[in-house]
């Protein structure tokens, strides 16, 4: 007979804990996202502190290929306020994304098509790791945006009519 048979096991899997730190809603409006992928990101200590405080802006960010790596460009992470200026980071520095070689090759082949680009979609905590969701998308034209707005309004009307 086991002594600990009446104890209930708690779910201690930290990988299931997600906390959204920054979201790029503008990219979802500007681009038709065809594929998404989760990537790690190489950060400095002060950048981690700033991101955990919600001081990251993904709106103008994009990804580029250099020397067989994917770099995250033009993402603003504010300097940490409690650190001296000597130890702080550059807010707009290029950050390396951590992906497998096969994923990098797949992303590169997808972006070689005309009009395709890689944009950051969201930044979140997965356990104790900061992860970035990037998407391959094609820029929407004005008529595509109008069509999406019409679809949203029609869907909203249908849902409100069904609730009555």
From Swiss-Prot:
InterPro entries documented for this protein: SmpB, SsrA-bd_prot, SsrA-bd_prot_CS
GO annotations of cellular component type: cytosol
CDD domains for the chain: SmpB (cd09294)
GO molecular function, one term: RNA binding
Pfam families: SmpB
Region annotation (Disordered) ranges: 141-164
Biased composition (Basic and acidic residues): 145-158
Function: Required for rescue of stalled ribosomes mediated by trans-translation. Binds to transfer-messenger RNA (tmRNA), required for stable association of tmRNA with ribosomes. tmRNA and SmpB together mimic tRNA shape, replacing the anticodon stem-loop with SmpB. tmRNA is encoded by the ssrA gene; the 2 termini fold to resemble tRNA(Ala) and it encodes a 'tag peptide', a short internal open reading frame. During trans-translation Ala-aminoacylated tmRNA acts like a tRNA, entering the A-site of stalled ribosomes, displacing the stalled mRNA.
Protein name per UniProt: SsrA-binding protein
Organism: Prochlorococcus marinus (strain AS9601)
Gene: smpB
